[in-house]
Amino acid sequence: MQVILLDKIVHLGQVGDQVNVKSGFARNFLIPQGKAVMATKANIEHFEARRAELEATAAANLAAAQARAAEVTALGSVTIASKAGDEGRLFGAITTRDVAEAVTAAGVKIAKSEVRLPNGPIRTLGDHDVRFQLHGEVFATLDVIVVAE
């Protein structure tokens, strides 16, 4: 099924690309979420008229994500207190939600879906590097310090 991409899709294409995708992927994901439209003659003409507007929106989203990434890296580190045993292991774990709440409390609004924990939930005390994916191609790294309560 031929579709026109209205947003950058990782491993698929850029704004304005006409790509051939499976019909289920188009009907169930791309079209309902507003990331693509069917590649009919009318839609192609309509898209060409709106191309500059869509590219400007994509550029604005990228700039906003880069600004947020600069804010996250400017924080330097965030401290999270959690209950821990004598050997430095936590009772429970620090998840993406906990990291997102700590960063938001520090002054930068982050959604838990933007937090990337490469080794899974944090289960030990100490310093941990956490990566944030704020946009498809914008990443930020922050040092999360886990201390015992």
From Swiss-Prot:
Signal peptide: none annotated. InterPro entries: Ribosomal_bL9 (IPR000244), Ribosomal_bL9/RNase_H1_N (IPR009027), Ribosomal_bL9_bac/chp (IPR020594), Ribosomal_bL9_C (IPR020069), Ribosomal_bL9_C_sf (IPR036791), Ribosomal_bL9_N (IPR020070), Ribosomal_bL9_N_sf (IPR036935). Keywords: Ribonucleoprotein, Ribosomal protein, RNA-binding, rRNA-binding. The keyword Ribosomal protein applies. GO terms for cellular component: ribonucleoprotein complex; ribosome. GO terms for biological process: translation. SUPFAM superfamilies: L9 N-domain-like (SSF55658), Ribosomal protein L9 C-domain (SSF55653). GO terms for molecular function: rRNA binding; structural constituent of ribosome. Coiled coil: none annotated. Binds to the 23S rRNA. PANTHER family: 50S RIBOSOMAL PROTEIN L9. Belongs to the bacterial ribosomal protein bL9 family. This is Large ribosomal subunit protein bL9. It comes from Haemophilus influenzae (strain PittGG). The lineage of its organism: Bacteria, Pseudomonadati, Pseudomonadota, Gammaproteobacteria, Pasteurellales. The gene is rplI.
